Curated annotation (Swiss-Prot):
Keywords linked to the UniProt accession: Iron, Iron-sulfur, Metal-binding
Keyword Metal-binding assigned: yes
One GO location term (cellular component): cytosol
Cofactor(s) required for function per UniProt: iron-sulfur cluster
Function: Required for insertion of 4Fe-4S clusters for at least IspG.
Any one Gene Ontology BP term: iron-sulfur cluster assembly
The record's free-text note on cofactor binding: Binds 1 iron-sulfur cluster per subunit.
Protein name in the entry: Iron-sulfur cluster insertion protein ErpA
Positions of iron-sulfur cluster binding: 42, 106, 108
Record-stated family: Belongs to the HesB/IscA family.
Species name: Haemophilus influenzae (strain PittGG)
PROSITE patterns in the cross-refs: HESB (PS01152)
Subunit structure comment from the entry: Homodimer.
Pfam family, one: Fe-S_biosyn
């Protein structure tokens, strides 16, 4: 785990608070939010979010408000400088990634290209 001074990715209060709420609903304090990148989507890469109980060797863990965000090393290289947030709007509620490395994104924001 690294401290706030050296974090290569921002985990917002809104995202951390939503993770805390969802973990509370599941009644499993071992859960962490994992963000990852996979090939696919209309722009070449897409973001994925899942809850995971384990942290693998090499994973980056960012802690905020008592909850953890976990990123694997392969995904982290595409996310450096980005922000993981949680938004509620007309399109619904969802975790989002604001990625300064993306040269283009699809309309829904779930896929990108570099």
């Amino acid at each position: 785990m690294i401290d706030d001074m050296a974090v290569p990715l921002t985990f917002t209060d809104a995202a951390a608070n939503k993770v805390k709420s969802l973990i509370s609903e599941e009644e499993n304090t071992n859960l962490k939010l994992r963000v990852y990148i996979t090939g696919g989507g209309c722009s070449g890469f897409q973001y994925g979010f899942t809850f995971d109980e384990k942290v693998n060797d090499g994973d980056l863990t960012i802690e905020k408000s008592g909850v953890q965000l976990v990123i694997d090393p392969m995904s982290l290289q595409y996310l450096i400088g980005g922000t993981v947030d949680y938004t509620e709007g007309l399109e619904g509620s969802r975790f989002t990634v604001n990625n300064p490395n993306a040269t283009s994104t699809c309309g829904c924001g779930s896929s990108f290209s570099i």
